[in-house]
Each structure stands twice: as structure tokens, then as C-alpha cells.
């Protein structure tokens, strides 16, 4: 068996899997009905990943209200896996309270708003407490802590100092960012540099054949400064993995489809999907393999949700898919600029 080779993340010494395992879909259906609850099934998928060489897990404290992090701990314990053989990434920003049944698309009453007022965002209070709670749920330190969104109410200096302090405290090894403008990322980075604090080694963003807005500023900035790129939803919530005439129940139940405007595709987006289908047939690979391969060809390490062992094998096979310049141009040609989604 050929194992997946690890790669360096950005300008750090940290080595990760070229494809990162997205753990948002492992947890509780109370959080989202498309989430997998069966731990036997989850552990089987995760162990298959591990045995093949995919050993980088991306989660967030918010996913299933903390349960996703606990599942990673339980997985490592169940198989007696050595901690140093895996990389654990998590995120902080959204509220987490395991005494509440917070939903993926949560709304809070006024009492919950009050209770959670300091359990969300990126204040020093929340970053330190949130990281300590994540470490408890994971049962170990965090390799890469990412700010899930930018908190526009907290001063950037406070954010970066708190992130620096959780690294120095030993809870976290590296820090990264997610889903923000290039100017915001740069200002945070320059703030850390000014004071000699730890800086981001990575950036997560929504990036795929249907949404390429970060090619304007964030991606060029990241590449210029050797920041690792970790696109989430590289298959556009599965839209790039099947022909236009096919659908799934998740489209109806996942509000992210609407916020990303995947519930009402533009004609050029439909054409891109048709072209992915055509090229995949010509190359005798699946549409998922092709769309993942495109992201890989862009120098990124995509975060992929994997709900079966077959999907794991499919994602790994994408590492062997090569695309010619003509094929890339053909896939990208219909794209038209869009407004910033996230």
C-alpha cells in the first residue's frame, strides 16, 4: 500500500496531509441533520484515513457544540493512536455551550444571548477560556488554532496578543485564520509582526471552481508570504460532485447552501458544473476527484468532508489526477466575478 506523503504547511515546519479531513460532519444530528452520529461508522472512516496516510483532522469547537472535538479524542483513545502521529486543527469564534442544544443555524433568546456574551467572538477572555475548553475536549494540545471568523468588535492587538499567549502557554503550537478579507488578514499579521508575536501560518477560505474571489487578493498575498492555503468546501457543498440533474436532501436542510448562493446557481456556474462532468468523463475519473484535483493544482491543501471509506479512497485518488493547461482553462473559462460570500 502506498501511503500519502505529508507536506509542509506554509512557511512553518509543520507537516500535514495534502488533503485535510473535515470533521464538521462528525457529531450530533441535533446540531445538523446531515451529520453522522454513529461512532462506529465515524471511527471506521477516520481509521481508514489514518491507515492511508491522511492524518490531519480539521474541526472546530462550534461543530456539534463541542462533540466533534470529543470524537477526535475518543478516536485516538479507541485505537491507541500516538498523539504525535496526527495533526489536529480546530477553530474558535462561535458560541459553544454543551448545556444548550445549539444548532448549526442557531438563534438565541435574550437570556442565552446574555449568558453567551463572553463565550463568542475573539476577546481575550473568550480565546483563553475557549482554548482551554477545546484542549479538555480533545484531551490534548492543539496543533493549529484558527480564528473561525474575524471579530470586528475586538481590537486586533487584543486578538493577536491572546493568540500569542495561548501558544506560549503550551495549549497551541501554531495559529491560522479563516474566512476574511486579505486586508484584514494582512493587518492582523502585521500587528503580530510589529510586537514580535506568533503569526498566522495558514488561511482557510471558501474556494472552489464555483467561487474564486480570493484569487484577487487573499491567495496572491498568501503565496507571496508563503502562507498555507486550506480551502473549505472545495467541492462547493457537493455541487461539483454530481451532474446538475442530481440532488441530495442536504440542499434542503443545510442553510449554508443559501448563504453561499448554491441554491440558485447562475448560468455560468451551471456551465462550470457541466464542464467538470465532461472533463471527468473524458479522463475517466469522478467529478469529485476532478474538482479536488483542480484545487490541489492551485497549490492548496483542501479540507474535504468524508462520509464513507469509498469517499476517502476517491479523495486520495485525486492526488494522482493531472490536469493540462488546456483543461484548467476550459474549466475556469465560464467563471464570472461574484460579491464576497464569506
Swiss-Prot record:
Pfam families: Aldo_ket_red (PF00248). One of its GO terms (molecular function) is aryl-alcohol dehydrogenase (NADP+) activity. GO terms for cellular component: cytosol. The keyword Transcription regulation does not apply. Keywords: Oxidoreductase. One of its GO terms (biological process) is aldehyde metabolic process. InterPro entries: AKR_Detox_Biosynth, NADP_OxRdtase_dom, NADP_OxRdtase_dom_sf. It comes from the Eukaryota. The keyword Membrane does not apply. Belongs to the aldo/keto reductase family. Aldo/keto reductase 2 subfamily. PANTHER family: ARYL-ALCOHOL DEHYDROGENASE AAD16-RELATED, NADH-SPECIFIC METHYLGLYOXAL REDUCTASE-RELATED. This is Putative aryl-alcohol dehydrogenase AAD16. The gene is AAD16.
Amino acid at each position: 500500500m502506498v501511503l500519502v506523503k505529508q507536506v509542509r504547511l506554509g512557511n512553518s515546519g509543520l507537516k500535514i496531509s495534502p488533503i485535510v479531513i473535515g470533521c464538521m460532519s462528525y457529531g450530533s444530528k441535533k446540531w445538523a441533520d446531515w451529520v453522522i452520529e454513529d461512532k462506529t461508522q465515524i471511527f471506521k472512516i477516520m481509521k481508514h484515513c489514518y491507515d492511508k496516510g491522511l492524518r490531519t483532522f480539521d474541526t472546530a469547537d462550534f461543530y456539534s457544540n463541542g462533540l466533534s472535538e470529543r470524537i477526535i479524542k475518543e478516536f485516538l483513545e479507541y485505537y491507541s493512536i500516538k498523539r504525535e502521529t496526527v495533526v489536529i486543527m480546530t477553530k474558535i469564534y462561535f458560541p459553544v455551550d454543551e448545556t444548550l442544544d445549539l444548532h448549526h443555524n442557531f438563534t438565541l433568546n435574550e437570556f442565552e444571548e446574555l449568558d453567551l456574551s463572553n463565550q463568542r467572538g475573539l476577546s481575550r477572555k473568550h480565546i483563553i477560556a475557549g482554548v482551554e475548553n477545546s484542549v479538555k475536549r480533545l484531551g490534548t494540545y492543539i496543533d493549529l488554532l484558527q480564528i473561525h471568523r474575524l471579530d470586528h468588535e475586538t481590537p486586533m492587538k487584543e486578538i493577536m496578543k491572546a493568540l500569542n499567549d495561548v501558544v506560549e502557554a503550551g495549549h497551541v503550537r501554531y495559529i491560522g485564520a479563516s474566512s476574511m478579507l486579505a486586508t484584514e488578514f494582512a493587518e492582523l499579521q502585521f500587528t503580530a509582526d510589529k510586537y514580535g508575536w506568533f503569526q498566522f501560518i495558514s488561511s482557510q477560505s471558501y474556494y472552489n471552481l464555483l467561487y474564486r474571489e480570493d484569487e484577487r487578493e487573499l491567495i496572491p498575498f498568501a503565496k507571496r508570504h508563503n502562507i498555507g492555503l486550506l480551502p473549505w468546501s472545495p467541492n462547493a457543498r457537493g455541487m461539483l460532485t454530481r451532474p446538475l440533474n442530481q440532488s441530495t436532501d442536504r440542499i434542503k436542510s443545510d442553510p449554508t447552501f443559501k448563504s453561499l448562493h448554491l441554491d440558485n446557481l447562475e448560468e455560468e456556474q451551471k456551465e462550470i458544473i457541466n464542464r467538470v462532468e465532461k472533463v471527468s468523463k473524458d479522463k475517466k475519473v469522478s467529478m469529485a476527484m476532478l474538482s479536488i484535483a483542480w484545487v490541489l493544482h492551485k497549490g492548496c491543501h483542501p479540507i474535504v468532508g468524508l462520509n464513507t471509506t469509498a469517499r476517502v479512497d476517491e479523495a486520495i485518488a485525486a492526488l494522482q489526477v493531472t490536469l493540462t493547461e488546456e483543461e484548467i482553462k476550459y474549466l475556469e473559462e465560464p467563471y464570472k466575478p461574484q460579491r464576497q460570500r464569506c
